[in-house]
UniProtKB/Swiss-Prot annotation:
Species per Swiss-Prot/TrEMBL record: Methanosarcina mazei (strain ATCC BAA-159 / DSM 3647 / Goe1 / Go1 / JCM 11833 / OCM 88) (Methanosarcina frisia)
Top-level EC class: ligase
Gene3D superfamilies: Anticodon-binding domain (3.40.50.800), Bira Bifunctional Protein, Domain 2 (3.30.930.10)
Spans traversing the lipid bilayer: none
Protein name: Histidine--tRNA ligase
Entry's family note: Belongs to the class-II aminoacyl-tRNA synthetase family.
Recorded catalytic activity of this chain's protein: tRNA(His) + L-histidine + ATP = L-histidyl-tRNA(His) + AMP + diphosphate + H(+)
An example molecular function term from Gene Ontology annotations: histidine-tRNA ligase activity
Keyword line: Aminoacyl-tRNA synthetase, ATP-binding, Cytoplasm, Ligase, Nucleotide-binding, Protein biosynthesis
GO-annotated cellular components: cytoplasm
EC number(s) stated in the UniProt entry for this protein: 6.1.1.21
Predominant subcellular localization, coarse grouping: cytoplasm
Length: 411
């Protein structure tokens, strides 16, 4: 019977895995330098965790199941809700703000296509416990720094849902949610039809459509002309000044709504070329979600980066590392094992495990593109030395083990 990998999943070859791990390590180093700590949450959670946050409609996208105890479970489709659950369960006593990051796989049952898989990896950041402009600015600047560190130039767009909601404050919450959803999907005909259906005033319709079509770096005066100098806009303006101090390149787009009810203020998205229709590589904003899971009214700001999309366009490659193969004959094999064991304290080393003859061992070293071969022969051992062969130039020399370590480690 033939068993294939499930649709929408991938196997990664050693070279691909090494590259992914390298890019991941670069990103980890960036967030660690910004003072964030890594957390890990379970691969599966109670189904309620995600239906509470996103509604019953999300079930069609989930890998959910009933466990042997009759409990409704699901593989995680995203990581913000698990982090908020973790905070409510265990992290509330910690000093604020809590600065957390994660790198985990997620699962969604959706149609696989370019840049979209049923198992995918997400790199994310959550700053919990501060609703200040400085927090928003740091999170945005960190997202920018992460993308820059992995060689991706993205088009960052910022919006603010609190500003949009000031125009909608007289409407029912369900209507506001529908409006935001239509704004997010840029379904302007549907938005106009909805506003007509509820009998919205012409001034509201005019102001809303003007606001959500405003784009550019220097549009705040126009925004103020529509909504006034409201506190939400004053706070947002402070965030923008901080971003200028961070040196972040951005533009404003008040048509960004992120499509999720829990976002409350600043929102942002980053788009990169070379990904076709799935060109968004990062998205986030400020939100109030913890209360939904039994915690207090705690402000948070965060973002997620689609790691698989990043890998499609990331130019980084792992630094080349010298590789060695220790070859020997049957009567010197035990000494070869000792040599390999010592060398592994300094660099990657392989030794024959197949009982190949001497010539076949050299051929294997050539096949795997080893940089060096160390020959452990009787004559070498009698002289207290080893033969180091450069597999590129073909040159070889007789050296002590210490000299070999010094020579190769210094390259």
């Amino acid at each position: 019977m033939s068993v294939n990998r499930p649709r929408g999943t991938r196997d990664f070859l050693p070279a691909d895995t090494a590259r992914r791990r390298y890019v991941e390590s670069v990103m980890r180093n960036v967030v660690l330098n910004w003072g964030y700590s890594e957390i890990i949450t379970p691969t599966f959670e109670h189904l309620d965790l995600f239906t509470l946050k996103s509604g019953e409609g999300i079930i069609g996208e989930l890998y959910n199941f009933t466990d042997k105890g009759g409990r409704e479970m699901t593989l995680r489709p995203e990581l913000t809700a698990p982090v908020m659950r973790f905070y409510v369960n265990e992290l509330q006593p910690f000093p604020k703000p809590l600065k957390l990051f994660y790198f985990e796989n997620c699962f969604r049952y959706e149609r696989p296509q370019k840049g979209r898989f049923r198992e995918f990896w997400q790199f994310g950041v959550e700053l919990i416990g501060s609703g200040k402009s400085d927090s928003d600015a740091e999170v945005i600047a960190l997202a920018s720094a992460l993308l820059k560190a992995v060689g991706i130039k993205g088009d960052m767009k910022l919006g603010n849902l609190a500003v949009i909601r000031t125009l909608l404050k007289g409407l029912e919450p369900e209507i506001v949610s529908n409006v935001m959803r239509l704004v997010d999907k840029k379904e302007y005909a549907g938005l106009e039809a909805l506003l007509d259906e509820i009998g919205a005033e012409e001034q509201l319709k005019s102001d809303l459509f003007r606001l959500i079509h405003l784009q550019g770096r220097y549009i705040l005066p126009e925004v103020k002309g529509i909504v006034g100098n409201i506190p939400e806009l004053v706070s947002f303006e402070k965030t923008l000044k901080l971003l200028d101090a961070y040196g972040v390149d951005y533009s404003l787009d008040f048509g960004i709504a992120r499509g999720l009810d829990y976002y409350t203020g600043m929102v942002f998205e980053v788009y990169a070329e070379g990904l076709g229709a799935q060109k968004q590589v990062c998205g986030g904003g400020s939100y109030q979600l913890i209360q939904l899971f039994g915690g207090g009214d705690v402000p948070s700001t965060g973002f997620g980066i689609g790691f698989d999309r990043i890998m499609e366009i990331c130019p980084l490659v792992p630094p080349a590392q010298k590789s060695l193969v220790v070859v020997s004959k049957p009567d010197t094999h035990l000494e070869a094992v000792k040599v390999a064991t010592e060398l592994r304290n300094y660099l990657p080393v392989q030794i024959d495990l197949m009982e190949r003859n001497f010539k076949a061992q050299l051929s294997y070293a050539n096949t795997i593109n080893a940089d060096y071969v160390i020959i452990v022969g009787e004559k070498e051992l009698e002289a207290g030395k080893l033969t180091l062969r450069d597999m590129v130039s073909g040159e070889q020399e007789l050296l002590t083990l210490e000299e070999i370590i010094e020579k190769i480690s210094g390259q």
